[in-house]
Amino acid sequence: MLQQKFPATAKSFFATHNFTKNLKQDFILSSSNEDEALQLYKQALFFSSNENIYYFPSYDTIPYDHTSPNANILSRRAEILTKLTTNNSNGKLLITYAANLLNKLPPKDFFSKYFLKLSPKMKFTTDELAMFLVENSFTRNASSIDVGEFAVRGEIIDIILPGPKAYRINFSWDYIESIKEFDIDTQISTKSCSELVISPANEIVLNSETNGNFKNNYLRNFGVNHTDNPLYEAVISGRKFAGYEQLLPLFYNSCSSLVDYLNDPIFIFDNLSKQAILEFEHSYNDFYSARSEVNKLKFNSFYPTLSPTDLYFTASEITELLEQKNNIFISYENSEQATLIENISSASFIEKKTVFDKLFEIIKAHSSKKIVIGAASLSGLERIKSITQNYEYKYNEINKLDEAKASVINVGIIPLNQSFYTKEYLFITASELLEEKSSSTNTNKKLKNILLELDNLAEGEFVVHKDHGIGQFLKLEALEIKGKLHDFLKILYAGNDKLYIPVENIEVIKKYGNDNAELDKLGSSSWQRSKAKLKNRIKEIALHLIQIAAKRKLNSSASVEFDLEEYDKFCANFPFSETEDQLTAINDIKEDLRNGMLMDRLICGDVGFGKTEVAMRAVFMVAKSLNEHLPQVAVVVPTTILCSQHFSRFIERFKGFGLNIKQLSSVISAKEAKIIRSELESGKINIIIGTHSLLHKNTKFFNLKLLIIDEEQHFGVGQKEFLKSLKSSSHVLAMSATPIPRTLQMSMTGLKELSIIATPPLNRLEVRTMVMPFDPVIIRDALLREHFRGGRSFYVVPRIKDIEDIEKQLKQIVPELSYKIAHGKMTPSKIDEVMSEFYAGKFDILVSTTIIESGIDIAEANTMVIHKADMLGLSQLYQLRGRIGRGKVRGYAYLTVASHKKMTSHSLRRLEIIQNSCALGSGFTIASHDMDLRGFGNLIGEEQSGQIKEVGTELYQEMLEEQIAIFKDEPIVSEQLFIPTINLGLSVFIPDNYISDSALKLGLYRRIGNLSNEIEVEKFKDEMIDRFGSLPIEFNNLLDIVKIKLLCFKLNIENLDSGDNGFVIKFYKNADMTDKILKFVSTYSNQAKIKPDNKLVYIKKLVDKNIIVEVNQLLWKLGGCRLDVIPNTSLRGAKRRGNLIK
């Protein structure tokens, strides 16, 4: 065994350097933890351009877990094992966490039989590819959005591979026409590929061979008592089951180690790696013992437990491999004078906050070397480039080390930990110069896409027709009209009456948004009376809202100016890099504060996504304003816990900036509160953070310039009235993950500015959410699982009276774990004491009511059980779940219910939404679902729903938008709007063999209903061709009819009918088209005439194949206009949602 000595920061450089010199040799670079392994891999990709450098990830689950690892990890591991198996021509460098060397994996030759290489022009069919994917653990869905999923649409197959990377394979008969990458969010293709290699989506491939192995090995290990075992039944049926990866050896006759996948590899390792191997062995033995103890209890699990020797190799077996003579053991040095292999040394002379004059002296001293400065983020890179230019040096931006040049400063986004130098290079990290932080690489879905996701419609939902009232959407149904099939929306009304709406007119119906609705009677006048009644009320609401907004805008405010250098210093103290959305929100606030009007903005961002930091930037700008005398900022929060947390954070962040910060809540004594109020009135306090205690008639401010309202949904009516009085002359910033429907609705009508923070922080994982009947086995497993990974758990009980029962259950289920209780009837000081102990890790489980909904931020607490979750509201559930998974560790939420049969449809719907809204950044979606469930609410009164129930949320929203636009004197289509009806005798529908999923098809129909001009129609058409292939004639007919309908709307044509001998046109009753009609009839007197009922008849022999051309020519002749000059106005007669968000 060779021993080498050099700085720890140069480990990846050393490994890639050795690999580059020995390209036929396999290497394994091991790390002491998973984060280091990933960092080493990223560094290796910079140091070398060799394609045979691989990273083998660890499971994100613990040994003997009953949940499956992340799909991306499963798929990535299988992909790497496939590459290691099939790439025999050259050497390989494998980077992995040392504990992975203990894993027992499928036999080495297994993956050589289960991969597929595709290329354009290759002979292959969609059926063959679909069969391969199913047999290799991929899941077939209507749309592919997650790793390991695929979708088949006619002659197109979409597939998501690790990364995630999405590919679209287009077939033509029995060969592959093209392979393209596509964007998962937009589903639009981006670039072509010459080759695609598809590996299994899991290390376990469910086929006849592996299922047979599983069945035999299962019986041999656990006997025949497997009846009614859902895991066993699922697997032998060829279906995946949560956590079945813990039984991997049962699927194969033999297993291999990771080392077996390489050819006599050289290990590069250190003492920490060896220690990690020993610790992991100790860990999985502990988990095995714990699992065995669980199985002895009466709560029998259907998860059998394999012994450690079945699942893992021993630490002694692996360490024996490490100590063989050709391997390289690394010891680290800290001294520049050490004797070093390859002349690598630490650059310890570069200290943090080195003045840049000293830096460039160092660069001059190493002028014979290539200088490389690595930044961790784009903002850091821009700062380094700017500084380099200021010192009159040339820079060369690089992505790989082999792009580095001499005599210039090479800069790039490079994941270096610390500075070091070699004989040829000097590597300097920007983090040591700028105190730079790693940034999140997650991309933000555009606001338009976030809003689009909300616009869904499901079978069985209540809908509202503008003319006929409330009905229930039953399904899409194809009807035969004049021998041609046409898709219709089938709507049920009272008395079992049915209304059929052609899909091209889908915009005439709106979502009602509430489960409990009474169906209207077709032809009844009661609907029109309800609508007219609400119209008058909406006028009052709209006028009041306009007056509020106008009053705020008339109250001009001096532009907020602050010291930029001091502000930059404040920003530099933020320990993370801002996400793209945070920067956007901060810039929005800057603009608001500088435009001379009072700000009124809502920040909607998921829990833990950085809203507080955005608020702190706003606080700094106002509190340090140069053109105000003693400006004050008030931060209002709903709970004492959140108040204490904010106070601590503000004190830490604003240290050294000369601002007096105080808190006011129930933990503050009456005497101290009186002093604080006095100092507020005199201007001695710059920033006050308070609960409802601050919203008191005795609270007076010297010069309140900014009011920040955190989690507004928790404040009562009286408190909101007091807040209103503060708002009238102050800048206002509201923050919430799930804002109350009223606040969100005001943002969506354009009366309150909206910023969305949808980009998760770096390495954030979504919380896995399970809705289930109470199961003591699963709950015990969940709580012990969290305990054994070194964490703590929340157990939320909605009602105080149920806490005693939960105590009894915990004593029985997990007697080995400790717990304490917190609820609203305890004194604030007692709650504070319990919370402090939980923060410190003095007990395992916090049993509490929903008082933890806001303000708890404990990185080690990542499991939550919610008792009787159906009793809680949607926003409450979302806020509670947001207490866990706030760091790099995955959170698990278990929403227990007594029985699905006992739940109302409303409760069941809430739980379905929270379970399905697992994606990071779902708060905006949750809030909008909340509006659907509760209604938008009366915007200016205390009533939550009122008369809105009579017309439904979407139509109410549209009527309000329209009335606001009228008062604001904005151009809008008249309320007496008509929807053109087009009957051309063509087949109009989306065929099942093109798109089979009815929900997806319905969503596309709704999008079609929102298309407002020819350009949008053509873009939509291009997207459909890209996603699903060439348009069938029936779908093409639909889009042609939409374009004709838009032109009819421009020409005030209410009905256009065709027959064998021509067209009949009926104009809208109030349309003034007399001159155009008379001119048209005069010009085409042989073909055109006006009937006694004022309909225009145009005689022309028609055939199907040219009817679209004929009707377009007719309309162009009639109107003398082109379609592309139609205003960008939807037929709904109101701005679309997406256009209302600024």
UniProtKB/Swiss-Prot annotation:
Coiled coil: none annotated. Pfam families: CarD_TRCF_RID (PF02559), DEAD (PF00270), Helicase_C (PF00271), TRCF (PF03461), UvrB_inter (PF17757). A motif (DEEQ box) lies at residues 710-713. One of its GO terms (cellular component) is cytoplasm. ATP binds at residues 605-612. It comes from the Bacteria. One of its GO terms (molecular function) is DNA helicase activity. The keyword Transmembrane does not apply. Keywords: ATP-binding, Cytoplasm, DNA damage, DNA repair, DNA-binding, Helicase, Hydrolase, Nucleotide-binding. One of its GO terms (biological process) is transcription-coupled nucleotide-excision repair, DNA damage recognition. Residues 778-932 form the Helicase C-terminal domain. SUPFAM superfamilies: CarD-like, P-loop containing nucleoside triphosphate hydrolases, TRCF domain-like. SMART domains: CarD_TRCF, DEXDc, HELICc, TRCF. In the N-terminal section; belongs to the UvrB family. Couples transcription and DNA repair by recognizing RNA polymerase (RNAP) stalled at DNA lesions. Mediates ATP-dependent release of RNAP and its truncated transcript from the DNA, and recruitment of nucleotide excision repair machinery to the damaged site. This is Transcription-repair-coupling factor. It comes from Rickettsia felis (strain ATCC VR-1525 / URRWXCal2). The lineage of its organism: Bacteria, Pseudomonadati, Pseudomonadota, Alphaproteobacteria, Rickettsiales. The gene is mfd.
